[in-house]
Amino acid sequence: MSLATLDATQHPNLPASAATLFKAKAQNKLSFEQIAQHIGRNEVATAALFYGQAKASPEDIQKLSELLNISPQVLEEQLSGFPDRGRSVEMPPKEPLIYRLYEIVQNYGYAYKAVLNEKFGDGIMSAISFSTKVEKETDADGNNWAVITLRGKWLPFSRF
């Protein structure tokens, strides 16, 4: 199994915790799925912790400390603040997979908006009251398909 690692030169805006966590992840040869199972989170949410895009709870810090053999004091210092979300990716993205996700929004963003507005009315889908997951499907011909589910609470615009 290949594991996701961090090349800090490609991610100059990540917090110090990213280097700490990714180094321990590599040393322990753990996947995000394995780490997620240990800390009781979704694997995308777990990866978001590593990239500094999600807030770690005290329980997350304790469990990560135990699993990754990192001092709880170091993790507490590096993970206890509020995330500075959205700074980790330059726009438009250059990394091909991230660019494809961006391209999906470019190509289908207004189509998603139109369909969502027809179904729910004037509003937005929350990225705060939100969950996501990634699944792998294999079709009858043996082709692998990525299935990304986005689930966000619908927030209607207020009239004032």
Curated annotation (Swiss-Prot):
Reactions catalysed, as given in the entry: cyanate + hydrogencarbonate + 3 H(+) = NH4(+) + 2 CO2
EC number(s) recorded for this UniProt protein: 4.2.1.104
The keyword Lyase appears for this protein: yes
GO-annotated biological processes: cyanate metabolic process
Catalytic center residues: 100, 103, 126
EC class: lyase
Statement: the UniProt record of this protein carries the keyword Lyase: yes
InterPro entries, A to Z: Cro/C1-type_HTH, Cyanase, Cyanate_lyase_C, Cyanate_lyase_C_sf, Lambda_DNA-bd_dom_sf
Alphabetical list of PANTHER family matching this protein: CYANATE HYDRATASE
Family: Belongs to the cyanase family.
NCBIfam families: cynS (TIGR00673)
Protein name according to UniProt: Cyanate hydratase
